[in-house]
Amino acid sequence: MEALLIIDMQVGSFQTPRFEAEKVIENINCLSIFLRKKNIPIIFIQHDGTKENFLVYGTDEWNILPSLIQETNDYRIEKEANDCFYKTEIETLLKKLGVQKLYICGCATDFCVNATVHGALVRDYTITIIKDGHTTADRPHATAVQLIDFHNWVWENLTPTQSRIEVKNTHEIIQ
């Protein structure tokens, strides 16, 4: 069984301009529509921030972007750390659903997406990164494009414990 993880695509995450945000949202929507038709679970991950930072539970900025397609039978997992597996119910849910393969997309490439990829790797999940389905912002020492390209390259070239990570564009999956 497979599942799609949509990480931190929250209103507050996009108060900072993100690289090709509209295109990323469009790609995630296309992929989620395709996977729902195949009865593949869609799991939205939401970061719970603190009053000292942002993404505080229950606030407008904590909500999933309204432009993302959500269905009532989609799953939602809250997290407090970058890695979706750290002190959350995700692993229990994935085991209950019989999931062994993850499609991973979302925000931010260099933080929560990357941390979750590594969390999934050490748990021996088969992983497909949605190459055009994750985004980030410019950082002090690298542009968003550089960070996205760098992480896509690293993920494609990692030597994980079982199977290699696939890095594919949306159209390669939905064709």
Task: Give each language-model segment a name.
Residues L4-F14:
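Metal-dependent nucleic-acid phosphoesterase active-site entry motif
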Residues Q10, D48-G49, A108, H134:
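Catalytic metal-binding/acid-base residues of hydrolase active sites
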Residues S13-T16, T50-N53, A137-R139:
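A short acidic, helix-capping loop that chelates divalent metal ions and anchors anionic groups
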Residues P17-D48:
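A short alpha/beta connector and helix-capping loop motif
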Residues H47-K51, E61:
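Glycine-rich, small/polar surface segments that engage phosphate groups of diverse ligands
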